[in-house]
């Protein structure tokens, strides 16, 4: 009876939190300590919650390539400063790409040098992805590809930025028939002059879910036929997957051998434009009806479309760019030198082109489409 009374008294006494912890510890410590082999414990990168040591300012992050670059930087645990000129709601899709507090959004003015300095002052990596498909009354190609990159490179140099990465184009040349490619060539020269150790990336035409390459040709279905200069038999293209480009840029931020080099990012295969467009229409299960159109007529049509106050369907400059063959930059390092294996077009094109199919063919297998013929020149 006494024991029972004592038991009731003990239960009635309130136990503090330290007493509970001590009691629990005494129970678990009495058992033998369990040894775990190190192979059982998970290892690897910490992902978005890790700290990569990279503090990167990404200009042009709201564009096609920018969202992939921000995602790869966030995945490796980098802090990313995102200058933006658009409405704040147009940046919402980027907010999920980094851990809490790792993405910093900063409104900036491309013609205000103080806002550029503010965007790069705390970064050790600056990436310029700014680009434009057509000219506007506010920004022409010289502003977009020459003046703004030069101002960003100058501000980065003054701020002591360790790495400056500038994205150009594979076909950038002073002798190009396309004004945008001539401007990009001048921009490369200006960036290299201001920031000699800059890393210059020259990707070919990029394809991906939101691209203006595969989607552009697929949208020709609305015109019932596809106009091509010389039917596309004189143009060779080597498109590259956008995720490969962004992964290469992310790897360049950490690769010590990349400083001061120019890289050419291309896909693994080269295609005649005719066979490439034929493959696009085959993937969408649409009838491919090509017809030859003289270059000067096509350029004149592009000039008319370029007069639109809205986003133009095509422009004179785009007509020129489409029909310029991709150079074979065998003398420049590529994606493989940054640890990236280029992805074939045939593996990822369905992600872009499925939405152009009718309901009847929406779920058909990609194996039903014959791959595009490749060339070696």
From Swiss-Prot:
GO terms for cellular component: mitochondrial inner membrane; mitochondrial matrix; mitochondrial membrane; mitochondrion; respiratory chain complex I. The modification N6-acetyllysine is found at residues 189, 370. This is NADH dehydrogenase [ubiquinone] 1 alpha subcomplex subunit 9, mitochondrial. The lineage of its organism: Eukaryota, Metazoa, Chordata, Craniata, Vertebrata. Expressed by the principal cells of the epididymis. Detected in flagella of epididymal sperm (at protein level). Accessory subunit of the mitochondrial membrane respiratory chain NADH dehydrogenase (Complex I), that is believed not to be involved in catalysis. Complex I functions in the transfer of electrons from NADH to the respiratory chain. The immediate electron acceptor for the enzyme is believed to be ubiquinone. Residues 1-35 form a transit peptide. Belongs to the complex I NDUFA9 subunit family. CDD domains: NDUFA9_like_SDR_a (cd05271). Binds 1 FAD per subunit. Its cofactor is FAD. Complex I is composed of 45 different subunits. This a component of the hydrophobic protein fraction. Interacts with BLOC1S1. Interacts with SLC2A4. Interacts with CLOCK. Interacts with RAB5IF. It comes from the Eukaryota. Keywords: Acetylation, Electron transport, FAD, Flavoprotein, Mitochondrion, Respiratory chain, Transit peptide, Transport. The modification N6-succinyllysine is found at residue 175. GO terms for biological process: circadian rhythm; response to glucose; ubiquinone biosynthetic process. Its main location: mitochondrion.
């Amino acid at each position: 009876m006494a024991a029972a009374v004592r038991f009731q008294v003990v239960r009635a006494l309130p136990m503090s939190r330290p007493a509970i912890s001590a009691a629990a510890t005494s129970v678990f410590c009495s058992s033998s300590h369990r040894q775990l082999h190190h192979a059982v414990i998970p290892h690897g990168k910490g992902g978005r919650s890790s700290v990569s040591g990279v503090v990167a300012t990404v200009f042009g992050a709201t564009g096609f390539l920018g969202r992939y670059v921000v995602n790869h930087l966030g995945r490796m645990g980098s802090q990313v400063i995102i200058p933006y000129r658009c409405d704040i709601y147009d940046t919402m899709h980027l907010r999920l790409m980094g851990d809490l507090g790792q993405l910093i959004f900063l409104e900036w003015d491309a013609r205000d040098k103080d806002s550029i300095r503010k965007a790069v002052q705390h970064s050790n990596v600056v990436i310029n992805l700014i680009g434009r498909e057509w000219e506007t009354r506010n920004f022409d190609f010289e502003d977009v590809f020459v003046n703004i990159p030069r101002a960003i490179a100058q501000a980065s140099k003054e701020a002591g930025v360790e790495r400056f990465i500038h994205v150009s184009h594979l076909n950038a040349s002073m002798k190009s028939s396309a004004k945008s490619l001539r401007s990009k060539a001048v921009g490369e020269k200006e960036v290299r002059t201001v920031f000699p150790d800059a890393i210059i990336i020259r990707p070919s035409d990029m394809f991906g879910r939101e691209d203006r390459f595969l989607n552009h040709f697929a949208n020709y279905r609305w015109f019932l036929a596809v106009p091509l200069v010389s039917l596309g038999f004189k143009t060779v293209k080597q498109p590259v997957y956008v995720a490969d480009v962004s992964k290469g840029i992310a790897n360049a931020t950490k690769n010590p051998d990349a400083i001061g080099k120019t890289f050419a990012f291309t896909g693994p295969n080269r295609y005649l434009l005719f066979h490439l467009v034929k493959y696009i229409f085959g993937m969408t299960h649409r009838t491919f009806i090509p017809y030859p159109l003289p270059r000067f007529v096509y350029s004149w049509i592009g000039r008319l479309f370029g007069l639109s106050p809205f986003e133009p369907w095509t422009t004179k400059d785009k007509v020129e760019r489409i029909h310029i063959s991709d150079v074979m930059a065998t003398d420049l390092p590529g994606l493989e030198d940054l640890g990236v294996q280029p992805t074939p077009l045939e593996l990822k094109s369905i992600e872009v082109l499925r939405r152009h199919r009718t309901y009847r063919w929406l779920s058909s297998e990609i194996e039903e489409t014959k791959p595009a013929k490749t060339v070696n020149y």
